[in-house]
């Protein structure tokens, strides 16, 4: 694609990714971070959030690895912390409102930072120790000192799509996934999922 000057496009419609209002990535594994940057580059979207001045596209990250967001903070406009079923619709409604009223990206981010579970990296100044470890994140622009993760209180009542738009290609391992519960009642100290998906939730 890069050699032929073909920008990354949506499988379903063929529309260029850079023309979307929001581009979202699930950070499932740390080793996929370079793939995220490669996709942004293929799409013709500037990699760093500071280089993207217009309101859209908003580049959003989320998923399990968002519990440690700093390695990718400079590339994301917003990062979803916690469970995204309810937060996603709130953010999309806000983005639609800002786009229709002609507001800037800065105004969108200043409103989004007040949504529980939304971390806006550009509103925090990081400082590091001599050994390279993070010393502090200092909030700016009135951002909260602590960003609390989003929690779905009732998995049976939260929004979930009834039908999915899926690409017309073979799926990985030819399998389907059904979530019957989230998290774990055991809380083993070595297990990330047992802690980041608390409190335990069940879908019936």
Role assignments for model-derived ranges:
Residues 47, 67, 120, 149, ...:
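Generic structural "secondary-structure junction" signal
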Residues 12-14, 97, 101-102, 146-152, ...:
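Short, exposed beta-strand "edge-strand" segments with a Pro/Gly-rich flavor and a Y/T-containing core
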Residues 2-138:
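Glycine-rich beta-alpha loop elements in corrinoid/cobalamin-binding modules
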Residues 152-204:
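Radical SAM [4Fe-4S] cluster-binding motif and immediate context
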Residues 7-13, 69, 108, 145-148, ...:
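Homeobox/homeodomain signature
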Residues 127-162:
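Active-site loop ensemble at the mouth of alpha/beta enzyme cores that anchors a bound cofactor
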